[in-house]
């Protein structure tokens, strides 16, 4: 009688459900996964080493390209680490702007997650709905930085510039009719704060639409309930953070447990799951988007009532204003020194962790007193989640693999660095 052997299958790195360049070597018994061996490193670009050869300010652009779905959240941890090293005070208005954009980025991340997860499991409509909403937030990115993704907007000491008083307008093109452009421009007639007031109301309706499509959908629940279950205790042992940890019922969120910026002044809840399966992780992320929407509204109200500076007045670290630089020799010298040499930080080491959309994103900097880091290390939340892939997939069907990979919400820009 012939001997039965398990079958080995390469899943990725070019599979559309691999979410980047994930390569999984799956050992299958029929259609059941016996073992999963994740291979990482295919998107390694040497970001940490590159940053060690550039002045601090010139590495902000690298941060956007780590997790390229949560751009400003990467910048946030990096500039906070530099500020901690320099013991630099940040203006209150800049803190609120940072928090507001961090929450916008959280929504951008979770919308892409629900879109990709939906399309992996056959829910095409959600993909289209989510991308329609993301356009509004990309317009906000573009308004403050000129870039729709890699903004480099956060700076040590604050943000690059204040919020604009006029939003970008859509123009008639061969793809956009005059009538459609006029409709799109209706909420864009005022300032960014006016636009965001309009957005937070509309976004609740958009979330309700996605909720209606998925939350009680029989097929969606069959694909996600009791799939990829992780207990609270095991999630902590595996080093899970973010929605992966909260989906297992652990109320750990750095914005509450170790508050930074102005989170201690804002009101929001920490959504948690009960069973730790794919469905709970979906519910947690949906609830997080509603909480982020509340935080954006609170920031908009505060920013409207409190004008002020958005960048530190320490010109050893933050550039002087352009008109001052062109009329004053001292400011010109500061500007020249800052952009040619950068600034030196005191000797020492710091670690800053922030509540990234995917979990705890940490930046460790060791300084030897030079104008560039002696050592830069990033803690990517996705690395711990990918490491648990064998445990998450074992015992499930091959068809459950895309659902589990999706709910991990992994991006290889930060995993491989």
From Swiss-Prot:
Keywords tagged on the record: Cell inner membrane, Cell membrane, Membrane, NAD, Quinone, Translocase, Transport, Ubiquinone
Gene name as annotated: nuoD
GO molecular function list: NAD binding; NADH:ubiquinone reductase (non-electrogenic) activity; quinone binding
Catalytic activity of the protein: a quinone + NADH + 5 H(+)(in) = a quinol + NAD(+) + 4 H(+)(out)
Claim: DNA repair is one of the keywords in the record: no
Membrane topology type: Peripheral membrane protein
Designated name of the protein: NADH-quinone oxidoreductase subunit D
InterPro entries assigned to the protein according to its UniProt record, in alphabetical order: NADH_Q_OxRdtase_suD, NADH_UbQ_OxRdtase_49kDa_CS, NDH1_su_D/H, NiFe-Hase_large
Similarity remark: Belongs to the complex I 49 kDa subunit family.
EC class: translocase
Source organism of this protein record: Francisella tularensis subsp. novicida (strain U112)
């Amino acid at each position: 009688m012939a001997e039965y052997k398990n079958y080995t299958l390469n899943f990725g790195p070019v599979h559309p459900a691999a979410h980047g360049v994930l390569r999984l070597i799956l050992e299958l018994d029929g259609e059941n996964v016996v073992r999963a061996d994740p291979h990482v490193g295919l998107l390694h670009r040497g970001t940490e080493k590159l940053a060690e050869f550039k002045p601090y300010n010139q590495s902000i652009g690298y941060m956007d390209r780590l997790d390229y779905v949560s751009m400003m959240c990467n910048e946030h941890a990096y500039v906070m680490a530099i500020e901690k090293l320099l013991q630099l005070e940040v203006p209150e208005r800049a803190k609120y702007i940072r928090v507001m954009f961090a929450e916008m980025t959280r929504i951008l991340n979770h919308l892409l997650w629900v879109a990709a997860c939906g399309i992996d499991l056959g829910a095409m409509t959600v993909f289209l709905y989510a991308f329609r909403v993301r356009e509004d937030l990309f317009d906000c990115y573009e308004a403050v930085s000129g870039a729709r993704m890699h903004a480099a907007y956060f700076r040590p000491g604050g943000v690059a510039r204040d919020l604009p008083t006029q939003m970008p307008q859509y123009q008639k093109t061969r793809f956009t009719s005059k009538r459609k452009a006029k409709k799109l421009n209706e909420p864009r007639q005022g300032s960014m704060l006016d636009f965001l007031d309009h957005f937070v109301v509309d976004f609740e309706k958009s979330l309700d639409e996605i909720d209606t499509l998925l939350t009680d959908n029989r097929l969606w629940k069959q694909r996600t309930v009791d799939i990829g279950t992780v207990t609270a205790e095991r999630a902590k042992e595996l080093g899970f953070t973010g929605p992966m940890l909260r989906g297992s019922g652990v109320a750990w969120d750095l914005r509450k447990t170790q508050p930074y910026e102005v989170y201690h002044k804002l009101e929001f809840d920490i959504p948690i799951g009960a069973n730790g399966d794919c469905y709970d992780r979906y519910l947690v992320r949906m609830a997080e988007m509603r909480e982020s929407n509340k935080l954006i509204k609170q920031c908009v109200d505060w920013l409207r009532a409190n004008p002020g500076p958005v960048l530190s007045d320490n010109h050893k670290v933050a550039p002087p204003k352009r008109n001052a630089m062109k009329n004053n020799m001292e400011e010109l010298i500061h500007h020249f020194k800052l952009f040619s040499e950068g600034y030196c930080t005191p000797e020492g080491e710091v670690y800053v962790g922030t509540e990234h959309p995917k979990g705890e994103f940490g930046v460790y900097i060791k300084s030897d007193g030079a104008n560039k880091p002696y050592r830069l290390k990033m803690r990517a939340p996705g690395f711990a989640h990918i490491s648990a892939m064998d445990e998450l997939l074992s015992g499930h069907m091959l068809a459950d693999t895309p659902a589990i990979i999706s709910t991990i919400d992994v991006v290889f820009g930060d995993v491989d660095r």
